[in-house]
Amino acid sequence: MTKPAFPSSTFRVLLSILLLVSVFLPACRKSPAPVFDAAAHKQEIEKWQSNRLAGLKKEDGWLSLIGLFWLDEGENKFGSDPSNKVTLPKEQAPTLAGTFKLDHGHVRLNARPGVAITTGGQPVSQMDLKDDNDDSGPTILNLGTLIINVVKRAERIGIRVKDTASRTRREFKGLDYFPIDPKWRIEARLEPYQPPKMIPIENVLNMTDDETSPGALAFEVNGKTYRIDPILEKGETDYFVMIADETTGRETYGAGRYLYVSPPDASGKVIIDFNKAYSPPCAFTAFATCPLPPQQNHLPFRIEAGEKKYAGVVH
């Protein structure tokens, strides 16, 4: 009888190894990279543009902002008389509607009898007001078509006034965009700051606040690596990014543009889609307090994506 080439025990071991390889080898193969769906991306950006427009045009959107008044310590009169500290449209307010009392950073409303101010649909004549830095948001006051709340910027306290019937809102000219371009949907990586870095951010009123940056976003354009610092705002998960580029002050708004990006995935990857870059509120109103891009976020190339500067008149 011819002897087997291998002892039976050896043959069984080899067979077991082959079976294991056949099971686990496919699992070890790298999955193919997902195919980019340009049509789906276009739909995503168009939906984002639609939501952007709706948010801008809503009753309490930035188009309705008509006034910003910084308070002095003590009593601050408000009403339609031009001598008041807070001047309201005469169609919506009496000559003297009441006072806002500023007391070491705290504001109290004192309305005159018969002035129909409400908050949350309920009449109010006296109350302490929360500002827009409060965790639950500011106290919103309504007087006719006016929407009034307290804002805090650096060490200053002010009264912001919106009007649902504002001229800017009525005469809004719409938004204009660069063509949607998937090349400006860029993969970046987060280079974390340990600990997170405090970055001084100046606004259009020359006020400066320190904001928290979780790390630099590093990405490539035309073979070169660039880094920008996002901001992680209080209570938010998405990163807020302020940028300027070589279109700034030309095709796009002169103070830069903003966008939000989702936080990094488990590998540290972040998608920056410049097709979602938009103009700050001060592109539409003279009464916003827009923060400005820090110097490290000034990019030395043209980003021909996202929102162009507003063609209408700012009142």
Residue ranges of each PLM-predicted region?
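Forkhead-associated
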Residues: L65, W70-S136
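Flexible, glycine-rich surface segments
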Residues: E187-T248, Y253
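Surface-exposed beta-loop interaction hotspot
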Residues: N142-D209
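Extended, aromatic/histidine-rich regions of cofactor-dependent oxidoreductases associated
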Residues: G174-Y177, T248-R250, Y260-P263, K269-I271, ...
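Bacterial signal peptide processing site
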Residues: R29-S31
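C-terminal motif of bacterial Sec signal peptides marking the signal peptidase cleavage site
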Residues: F24-A27
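Bacterial N-terminal signal peptides that target proteins for export
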Residues: T2-L15
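An exposed acidic His-Trp-rich patch
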Residues: T119-D134, T225-K276
